[in-house]
Amino acid sequence: ISACLVGSEMCIRDRNSAVDGGNMLLHSFECLLTIDQDGKIAPGQAETWEVSEDGLTWTFHLRDGLKWSDGSDLTADDFVYSWKRVCDPVVAAPYAETVLGMVKGFDEAQAGDLDALAVSAPDAKTLVVELSNPCPYFESLAAFATLSPVQQATVEANGDAWATAAETYISNGPFYITEWVPGSHITMSKNPNYWNADAIKLGSIKFVLMEDSNAAYTAYQSGDVLFIKDVPTQEIPSLQGNPEFHVEPNLGTYYLSMNLEDPAFADVNVRKALSLAIDRDYVANTLMQGTYSPAYNLVGEGWVDTDGSSFNANANGGQSYISDDFDANLEEAKQLLADAGYPNGEGLPTITYTTNDAGYHKTVAEYLQQAWGELGINVEVNIVEWSSFTPMRRNGEYMVARNGWVGDYSDPSNMLDLFCTGNGNNDGKFSNADFDAAMEKAASTMDTAERSAALHQAEDVLMEQVGCIPVAYYNDFWLQSEKITGIWHSAYGYWYFMYGDIAE
């Protein structure tokens, strides 16, 4: 299969610290657990697992005969090393607290005492994890890419460079990288040492790297690639009804990050004004041609509350200051801006909006320029390449930036944790004591009703303080040749090619 999934040249990643590139890398690495075709947790490197009655001890039993792609044995000790490495302050993994913050000894490990992390291997096939508080979704974390194993000998022999070349990129998944041509493609070949290699029909997968969705579309039309993830927006109307065009929801929100260390956004009224001036229905249904849904809270459809119901349906209306009347919202925005000392936008610095040029991002940027212009605010649009965009945003080199998050698991904490003080993915540097306290409560209580209330309280605080500006809820839309069989898409924004095939 030849597929175009990403535009970044920075695609080979250190599994323990990666943030993007997951669509490719899930084919070369496998965690203890994985996600099956129905979106359910399934055995991966671990064949079975159990949790103690108090919810504090998780035990995973590995399969017999696990191997690395170089043919060497893979044992529970490899997971111990890798999970402790995630906590290493030198590695500085952005997801560390998200995936291991509930494990006993995490804080000490983050401070440099890696052996304090309560992860152990009593034998070569058993991994024991002790939690400081129950985590009902921990099995989802055990399927999350950051907790993939990495080969200790290779990492220690090559340092950070281990993850930058195909020959040192030793992995344990159904495929392994055999060729990487920066800016062109990454080729993965079937891993004969994978535990389920007999079920893998494809000999190789070629991931083509293209920054331009129009070029990808041309390649698809010519048959050079059989799958493209980023469909040019102008082509969508003509593709409606085409059996090769697919649209499915995912657990994601398209939102705006404001650099809250910038004095321009110090007043919550300014932040509310920017939010109120956005016509979300117009953005989702007109600009995005109905491929997204309007977002009025951070946590969208599909996220599961503690009782199994929809978290979004139970939302308390954190953005209750936004009415159904957009004209009224616009007038309120103007008043809030005046209350903040910027009547008609006077005195407010020019806002630079930074985004990458893919999908609807440029279209949304131009809309924001016009919408905020209605408030008298001057907006400049800064378009940067994807490979530069994420580091710029993470380093705070922006005023307002496009952002987005697709769930790694269906618990709402996965979305809300982003905004905890000090979180590695908190690009806007939102910091609020009430929010942090609510999230701490959600992480520590064993009562499901209390946990639900705490999570909703956290979202309410985030929305009322406008720690970010939700704009739309994601759907994934893609083109897939009818020649491709056996692949599937998950609500987490991933495509699974490993058990696919090409029909003759």
Predicted regions and their residues:
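N-terminal lobe/hinge region of extracytoplasmic solute-binding protein
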Residues: S8-E9, R13-E53, I170-S171
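Gly/Pro-rich hinge or "lid" segments in bacterial periplasmic/extracellular proteins
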Residues: Q37-K40, L114, A124-K125, L131-I200, ...
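Short, small-residue-biased leader/transition segments that mark boundaries at the very start
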Residues: I1-I12, M188
